[in-house]
Structure formats: structure tokens, C-alpha cells
């Protein structure tokens, strides 16, 4: 039987910065262990059925399927979340949205809305950090709502709920001190949609018209009806869209408009306060 070390050395994945790490995650998953097990027991022999499972995982990855979809989970903030192909994979850059939200409101009671929640990543991270906040996450995809609810139940979070809604459509009369969203913001003609992991992600969670701003425009237009006085709206957007989003916020009647940079130095999150 092959050893852990042999299988990792023999793993053939497309050359990329994450190829070695991808193989480790996939073998650990096939074994039902953590990646530290691989380093602790490199000479451990692997059962044939485990080797076959690992080979199947590798083939899916060679075809470009994201590791998160193969494993059915993804880390975000301090959380381990279930993911599925009908939801966007949570990304590290989106943690900036969480950090910004935590800075905007005090730790006391507040009603907070997460639009287009997907896996529930943003709402769940905020619920973890602010036990007094009452979080609502909405998504138009019923499967995403079910998945987000499963994540909340598994994490034991009682201060968050998830409901099906196309943006604000199911929230008549509801007002919040803070609204956050990582909406679709990729241009329909963007060639990156045909490359890498995004080929496997739902286009409805990625694409927003010819300039990538259709959903952001709608959210900024409708948010004042659902914000309390002096409430905040925080939006993630593309690396080159900050100026356009700030202009939309100013034109929408928001004040204290500004942007923050992500890990790569790009303005990735913009926000404003309702006058």
C-alpha cells in the first residue's frame, strides 16, 4: 500500500501556488483527518479505498473544480462553513466587510441585515462577534437559505435568522441600523468568468450587468427605505469600482462616504451613512 508521503509526492495537479496545499487538503479529507496528521505520519500506509477517494478528488481538482466544493466546506473569519455549488465560496477579502461592519456600530443591541447572504458567512461572522446584534440574512435562492440555516445551527448561533428574499422584497416595513452586502459586481463581459474557480460558481452570484453595478445601484436606491436614521450601508465591490460606488452613495443621499482597502491594496469596500 502507498504511504501518505508517496501519495502527496505523486499527486499531479496543475502548477499553481496552491497545488501542494490543495493536495494536502484533499488527502486529509479522503483520510477523514486534519492536515497536521499528514505531517505527523508521513510513512503511514493508506488503504486502497482511501487512495481511490483521493484520486477521485484529484481528478475533480484537475478539471478546475474548487477545493471548497470538493470538500463541501470553507473557512471564513473564525468559522468552518458548509458550502455548495449554489453559493459563492467565501473569500478572505470579504473579511474586510466584516471588520468594517464591526467598526460602524457599538456592541449593544442592533438590527443588522445581510443582503445576498449565500452561505451566511458575513452574517454568521457578525453574529459570532456581536451577541447582542440581531442578524437577518436574505438570499433569493432557497437552497442557499437552507444551507445558511444549517451553518447557523451547527455553530449554535441563536441571534441570526435567514429568509428567502430578492434583496428587500420580503422585508416591507423592516428597518436596520446597518445593512451589509457582498452583491454580484462582475461585468458580464469580464474574461475572468471563463477562468479558474469562478467557472464553477453560480453566475447569479457574480455577474451584475454590463458595468457590474446593476445590483449595487438597486441596493443603494432601496436601502434608505430600510435604514434607521444615521444607519450605515456597507458594500463590497470590484477592485476598480470604488469611485463609481462612492458616487452612487453620494447621489443616493448618503454622507460620510468612504472606502477601505483589501489585503492587496485595492479599495474593496465602500460605505456611507444615511443622512
Kindly give the residue locations of the regions a language model identified.
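Conserved Class I SAM-dependent methyltransferase catalytic core
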Residues: 210-273
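Residue-level signal for inorganic ion chemistry
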Residues: 26, 64, 94, 122, ...
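Conserved SAM/SAH cofactor-binding pocket of Class I
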Residues: 92, 96-192, 197
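Active-site beta-alpha loop architecture of Rossmann-like, nucleotide-cofactor-dependent enzymes
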Residues: 68, 186-189, 240
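Mobile active-site "lid"/loop adjacent to the S-adenosyl-L-methionine
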Residues: 185-215
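Short helix-capping segments at alpha-helix termini
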Residues: 16-17, 130-132, 153-158, 226-227, ...
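Conserved AdoMet
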Residues: 25-103
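Non-catalytic nucleic-acid substrate-recognition regions in nucleic-acid-modifying enzymes
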Residues: 1-22
Amino acid at each position: 500500500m502507498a504511504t501518505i508521503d508517496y501519495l502527496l509526492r505523486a499527486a499531479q495537479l496543475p502548477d499553481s501556488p496552491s497545488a501542494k496545499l490543495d493536495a494536502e487538503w484533499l488527502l486529509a479529507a479522503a483520510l477523514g483527518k486534519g492536515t497536521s496528521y499528514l505531517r505527523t505520519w508521513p510513512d503511514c500506509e493508506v488503504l486502497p479505498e482511501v487512495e481511490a477517494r483521493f484520486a477521485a478528488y484529484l481528478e475533480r481538482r484537475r478539471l478546475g473544480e474548487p477545493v471548497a466544493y470538493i470538500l463541501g466546506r470553507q473557512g471564513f473569519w473564525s468559522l468552518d462553513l458548509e458550502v455548495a455549488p449554489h453559493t459563492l465560496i467565501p473569500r478572505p477579502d470579504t473579511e474586510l466587510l466584516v471588520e468594517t461592519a464591526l467598526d460602524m456600530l457599538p456592541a449593544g443591541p442592533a438590527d443588522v441585515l445581510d443582503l445576498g447572504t449565500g452561505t451566511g458567512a458575513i452574517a454568521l461572522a457578525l453574529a459570532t462577534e456581536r451577541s447582542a446584534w440581531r442578524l437577518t440574512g436574505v438570499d433569493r435562492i432557497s437552497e442557499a437559505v437552507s444551507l445558511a440555516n444549517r451553518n447557523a445551527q451547527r455553530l449554535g448561533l441563536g441571534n441570526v435568522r435567514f429568509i428567502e428574499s430578492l434583496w428587500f422584497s420580503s422585508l416591507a416595513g423592516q428597518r436596520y441600523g446597518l445593512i451589509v452586502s457582498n452583491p454580484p459586481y462582475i461585468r458580464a463581459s469580464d474574461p475572468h468568468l471563463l477562468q479558474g474557480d469562478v467557472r464553477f460558481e453560480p453566475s447569479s452570484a457574480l455577474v451584475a450587468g454590463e458595468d457590474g453595478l446593476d445590483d449595487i445601484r438597486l441596493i443603494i436606491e432601496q436601502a434608505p427605505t430600510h435604514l434607521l436614521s444615521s444607519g450605515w450601508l456597507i458594500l463590497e465591490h470590484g477592485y476598480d469600482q470604488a469611485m463609481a460606488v462612492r458616487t452612487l452613495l453620494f447621489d443616493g443621499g448618503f454622507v460620510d462616504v468612504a472606502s477601505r482597502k483589501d489585503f492587496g491594496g485595492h479599495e474593496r469596500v465602500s460605505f456611507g451613512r444615511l443622512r
